């Protein structure tokens, strides 16, 4: 079985017939180290993008997608449709990201 499956935000995959296997999720909670948090606090005073947190969000998103993909593979899926993200803060320096969608298996 391949590690590469299609993950799409669309409702359907044009030209493919499939059965729904169920929901799949990928979850992660990330935080930056204390030094990056101090730098972010200083940046908060003067304004502008806080790159350490942007990087953390990008990393969190990638981890969540990888975990969603693994969850789908374990279910025997060929693809994930309707993939979405949700995120939220925990305290002042942690971020949770959930990637979720519907695992499907192609019908020949």
From Swiss-Prot:
InterPro entries linked to this entry: UPF0145_dom_sf, UPF0145_YbjQ-like
Spans through the membrane: none
A Pfam entry, by short name: YbjQ_1
UniProt xrefs under SUPFAM superfamilies: YbjQ-like
Family, as annotated: Belongs to the UPF0145 family.
Name the record gives this protein: UPF0145 protein LCA_1282
Species of origin: Latilactobacillus sakei subsp. sakei (strain 23K) (Lactobacillus sakei subsp. sakei)
